[in-house]
């Protein structure tokens, strides 16, 4: 019995030392440039501006972020030119937009018909030169949902990129 225990202990030590062996360093493919700067680029990505969430009940959603999570939450702001009412949720390093449809023609109404509980609608990323970004992305065969840049909910130029060209995510680019 002692011999069996000794052998088991030796095997365990051997297994443990194999588990402790240094893991080989794997270097991810990268360039020496930061992700937001590409050599020769005439535009650069900035920070994540916001994540927009379509909600079936704007008051309930706003109360959750304010009363349960303790976030700073704005009053509801109707934006008829965009077909939504929006509540802005300040998260410190970024924002969330809670979107609720204004009328049946709202793009958010269609989203909520397909997603009854609501959900993430889009992300917004700032760019330093939206016109250059649009021209460059067109050359790269990335489609947008409109032909031209429009003024967004924050009063800045924006354009939405087609989700089929962006890994299934609706991406809004906003002039920083």
Curated annotation (Swiss-Prot):
Pfam families: Glyoxalase_4. GO terms for cellular component: mitochondrial matrix; mitochondrion. It catalyses: (R)-methylmalonyl-CoA = (S)-methylmalonyl-CoA. GO terms for biological process: L-methylmalonyl-CoA metabolic process; short-chain fatty acid catabolic process. It is an enzyme of class 5 (isomerase). Co(2+) binds at residues 50, 122, 172. It is linked to Methylmalonyl-CoA epimerase deficiency: Autosomal recessive inborn error of amino acid metabolism, involving valine, threonine, isoleucine and methionine. This organic aciduria may present in the neonatal period with life-threatening metabolic acidosis, hyperammonemia, feeding difficulties, pancytopenia and coma. This is Methylmalonyl-CoA epimerase, mitochondrial.
């Amino acid at each position: 019995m002692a011999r069996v225990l000794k052998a088991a202990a030796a095997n365990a030590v051997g297994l443990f030392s194999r588990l402790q062996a240094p893991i080989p360093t794997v270097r991810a493919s990268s360039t020496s440039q930061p992700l937001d700067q590409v050599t020769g680029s005439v535009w650069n990505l900035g920070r994540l501006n916001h994540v927009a969430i379509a909600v079936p009940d704007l008051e309930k959603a706003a109360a959750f972020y304010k009363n349960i999570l303790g976030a700073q939450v704005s009053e509801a702001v109707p934006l008829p030119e965009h077909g939504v009412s929006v509540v802005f949720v300040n998260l410190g390093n970024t924002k969330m937009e809670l979107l609720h449809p204004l009328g049946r023609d709202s793009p958010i109404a269609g989203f909520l018909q397909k997603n009854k509980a609501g959900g993430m609608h889009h992300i917004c990323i700032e760019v330093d030169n939206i016109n250059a970004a649009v021209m460059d992305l067109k050359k790269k065969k990335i489609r947008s949902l409109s032909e031209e840049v429009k003024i967004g909910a924050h009063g800045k130029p924006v354009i939405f990129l087609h989700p089929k060209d962006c890994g299934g995510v609706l991406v809004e680019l906003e002039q920083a």
